[in-house]
UniProtKB/Swiss-Prot annotation:
GO terms for molecular function: rRNA binding; structural constituent of ribosome; tRNA binding. The keyword RNA-binding applies. This is Small ribosomal subunit protein uS13. Residues 92-124 are annotated as: Disordered. The keyword Transferase does not apply.
Length: 124
C-alpha cells in the first residue's frame, strides 16, 4: 500500500480511484492532481514509481485535505452557531440546514422517532 498524506491507498486499484480514499479528494480533484503530475489515470498504484508517488504527494499537498479540511469545516459550523445565523441555529438543533422539509422525512438528521404518548379519550 502506498502512503500519501498519511493515508494508505489501495495498491490494486487505479490511481484515480485510490486517491479518492483521501478526505477532500473526489474524482474531479483526483483527475486534476494526476493531470498536473502528468500521470495516466488508468495506471495502477502498484505500477507507480517512487518519483511518481513523490510528484503526487507534492501536488496533493497544495490542497487543503484530511485533518486540516475537517478542522476548517468544524470551525465554519461553529462560527455559524456563534454568530447566531439561521444555519447555525439548525445545526445546534440537529435539524436539516439547507431547507429540506421536516414534517415527514429528515430522520437521518433528527435521529430515531421519539413517540409521544396520547391521552386516552374517555367514552361517555
Amino acid at each position: 500500500m502506498a502512503r500519501i498524506l498519511g493515508i494508505d491507498i489501495p495498491n490494486n486499484k487505479r490511481v484515480e480511484i485510490s486517491l479518492t480514499y483521501i478526505y477532500g479528494i473526489g474524482k474531479p480533484r483526483a483527475q486534476e492532481i494526476l493531470r498536473k503530475a502528468k500521470i495516466d489515470f488508468n495506471k495502477r498504484v502498484k505500477d507507480l514509481s517512487d518519483e511518481e508517488l513523490a510528484l503526487i504527494r507534492s501536488v496533493a499537498s497544495t490542497y487543503v485535505l484530511e485533518g486540516d479540511l475537517r478542522r476548517d469545516v468544524a470551525l465554519n459550523i461553529k462560527r455559524l452557531m456563534e454568530v447566531g445565523s439561521y444555519a447555525g441555529l439548525r445545526h445546534r438543533r440537529g435539524l436539516p440546514v439547507r431547507g429540506q422539509r421536516t414534517k415527514s422525512n429528515a430522520r437521518t438528521r433528527k435521529g430515531p422517532r421519539k413517540t409521544v404518548a396520547n391521552k386516552k379519550i374517555e367514552s361517555k
